[in-house]
C-alpha cells in the first residue's frame, strides 16, 4: 500500500526521530512510504485559539498536499483528530462546500498510527524488541475524539522484552492542551504534577504515548524532577528491534510528490 506520512509540525520541528521511526516501521511492514513535500500544519492550533478564518488556507493546503494519497498516517492522535473533526467544519463555515467535501473524503483515509496498524494492516505484533518497563498514557484526543481504545496497548503487549505496567488515572489529561498550558499555567502545572505522580508510582523506565506534544510536557516535568523516567513515543518503541539503530544508519522515507 502507498502510505503518505503526515509528519505534523511538532514532530517535524522538535522530534524528527518520531517521524523517521514511523517511516521505518511502516516500511518494515511492507508499505510504500512517501512524504508529500508540500505538507504543513493541519490548522488545529489556529482553530483552537479562535483563528478559524486564518485556518482556511491551511486546510486547503493540507487537502492539496495529500490529494490522491491511498492512506495518510500520522504519529499523532491530536492532529488526526483535528483532520477528522475540524477541517471540514472550517471550510463549511467559510462557505466553501467543495473544500469541505474534499476534507471529509481525505479524513476518511487518514489514520493515527495505531489505528492504521491494527485496523487497516491487521497487525498487532510488528516485530519490535524493547527490553524496558513501560507505562502508557492515552492522550486526550486519541482517547476521546478518535477513540483508539486499547489499540496501542495491543501493540505494546506484543513487543518482545517489554514489561507493560498499567498507569493509574490513565484517562486524566496531562495538562498540556497546546496553548492551554500557556494561558492556564497554574492549572496545567497542577494537572502535570498529578500525572507525573501516577507515572512515577509505576516505577516504569519509560512513559510512552501517541502524541509528541504530551510527551514533551510530561518529559519536561520528569526531567526537572530528575526522576530517571524518560518519555519515548509509541512509534519509536514499535520501530525498535534487536539491531541497534544509530543516527547514521537511519533512513528517511523517500520524498515524492
What do the predicted segments below correspond to?
Residues 1-257:
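Iron-sulfur cluster-binding electron-transfer modules in prokaryotic oxidoreductases
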Amino acid at each position: 500500500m502507498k502510505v503518505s506520512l503526515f509528519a505534523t509540525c511538532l514532530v517535524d520541528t522538535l522530534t524528527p526521530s518520531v517521524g523517521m521511526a514511523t517511516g521505518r516501521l511502516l516500511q518494515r511492514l511492507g508499505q510504500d512510504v512517501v512524504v508529500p513535500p508540500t505538507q504543513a500544519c493541519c490548522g488545529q492550533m489556529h482553530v483552537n485559539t479562535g483563528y478559524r478564518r486564518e485556518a482556511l488556507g491551511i486546510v486547503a493546503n493540507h487537502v492539496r498536499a495529500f490529494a490522491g494519497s491511498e492512506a495518510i498516517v500520522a504519529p499523532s492522535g491530536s492532529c488526526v483528530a483535528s483532520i477528522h473533526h475540524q477541517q471540514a467544519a472550517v471550510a463549511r463555515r467559510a462557505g466553501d462546500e467543495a473544500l469541505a467535501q474534499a476534507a471529509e473524503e481525505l479524513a476518511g483515509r487518514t489514520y493515527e498510527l495505531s489505528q492504521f496498524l491494527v485496523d487497516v494492516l491487521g497487525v498487532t505484533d510488528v516485530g519490535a524488541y524493547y527490553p524496558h518497563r513501560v507505562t502508557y498514557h492515552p492522550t486526550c484526543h486519541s482517547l476521546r475524539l478518535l477513540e483508539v481504545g486499547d489499540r496501542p496497548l495491543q501493540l505494546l503487549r506484543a513487543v518482545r522484552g517489554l514489561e507493560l505496567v498499567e498507569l493509574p488515572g490513565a484517562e486524566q489529561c496531562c495538562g498540556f492542551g497546546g496553548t492551554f498550558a500557556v494561558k492556564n499555567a497554574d492549572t496545567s502545572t497542577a494537572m502535570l504534577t498529578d500525572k507525573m505522580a501516577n507515572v512515577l508510582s509505576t516505577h516504569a523506565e519509560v512513559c510512552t504515548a501517541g502524541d509528541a506534544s504530551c510527551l514533551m510536557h510530561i518529559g519536561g516535568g520528569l526531567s526537572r524532577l530528575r526522576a530517571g523516567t524518560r518519555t519515548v513515543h509509541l512509534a519509536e518503541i514499535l520501530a525498535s528491534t534487536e539491531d541497534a539503530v544509530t543516527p547514521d544508519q537511519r533512513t528517511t522515507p523517500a520524498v515524492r510528490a
